Amino acid sequence: MNNSNSSLSFFSFKLSAMPVLILFLLIAPGILGINFIPPAKKKYKPGYIRMVFKNTVDGAALVMNDSVYTNVFGENYRVSKLKYYISNPGLKNSILLQKEKNGYHLVDASAPASQSFIFAVRPGEYHSVFFLMGVDSAHNCSGAQTGALDPLHDMFWTWNNGYVMVKLEGLSPVSPAINQRMEYHIGGYKGRDKVLEEISLIAPSPIVIKAEKTTEVIIETDISKWWQFGNPVPIKGTPICATPGQMAKKIAENYRNMFSLLPGSIIK
């Protein structure tokens, strides 16, 4: 009996002492001047992605001013200006999404240096490229800005307090407008007039990003899709669209299909 009582007493002592032990373990580091430092996150050396935009018409390189092109309606036209905004570009796979922070780029067909840009991403294999065609709503309402969003680039409507997301200008003999001009300034960032288009392009093969290396991908922008890809927009019927509204939305629904990711990528 004595042995049994001794065992019970010892067991009870252990239980009663447990909270004290736990408390000691919690406060001891502070008393002894020991700071608990969580394990550092594993750092990685970034790789880089260069996105190159190749402007074409039916697969052939776009030549400004001189070349005559024919749309799906048999209408001839020349292009004198093509500019469009690419915002917040990035890469993704099934578990990882990497996006350029505050990435705003104005691609200008007459300025080769504007047709590519580079940013850092985590090394790995990615399966698709994504970006916003246009400028997000927040930056349409942020007042005067710099860089690609500077109003001096002639892509901002002061009268409407918003950006022109895409601008296509030129001439066409079928245009009933003055001087046979065609002019498409597509904008609208809120409500039913919103023309912002989220673009996601599946890569034909994995896009491999290696640490401290640059991988180049080429995105084709084929403006032949502008005229008809769900919404017929013949030049003769609509030579000019320069305000937000239903026609601008129809054109935006067409031009979202202009983009395709060309096969292969180059690691440099």
PLM features: what roles do these ranges have?
Residues 1-44:
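Bacterial Sec-dependent N-terminal signal peptides
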Residues 38-268:
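A short, solvent-exposed, low-complexity linear motif enriched for acidic/polar residues
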